[in-house]
């Protein structure tokens, strides 16, 4: 079953991970957050996952997002995860994701918050994500996360496809990229 089918068939949080080193040796968790991610129903859940992970590992969690999303992240972290060492940096445009290449070292974990097609934080630039990650972050530990969505899978109607037709081949591209990467390594 390809990733697209898996994502379309569930409203649950899905993480795709590639670790190049033991998790307990990570020094930093860098999280790239798309605009409007704060409006997704699973927002608080994934923030909690990575703040807890940072606390347990004793490493800093560094969020990169636009100004509005960063404000919401700061409020949430201050309220629920004040003991977690965090940093917040502005990532003006999601297309600037490549600017993170200078921020992510070999002993860092890069987390890319993605979205299912049709959700409020979905961006067409997600279509280029597999190629970008493969080209610029191939030597980094990586997690791509698709946050929780409300409703049962068959009840979800997206903005881009209100009739619920087969969504796209983009999830399949991510799956093929991971398959090729795993096969290569």
Regions found by a protein language model. Name each.
Residues 96-99:
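Repeated scaffold domains used in trafficking and secretory/extracellular systems
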Residues 102:
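PAPS-dependent sulfotransferase catalytic core
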Residues 1-94, 105-109, 114-185:
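Intrinsically disordered or low-complexity boundary/linker segments at protein termini
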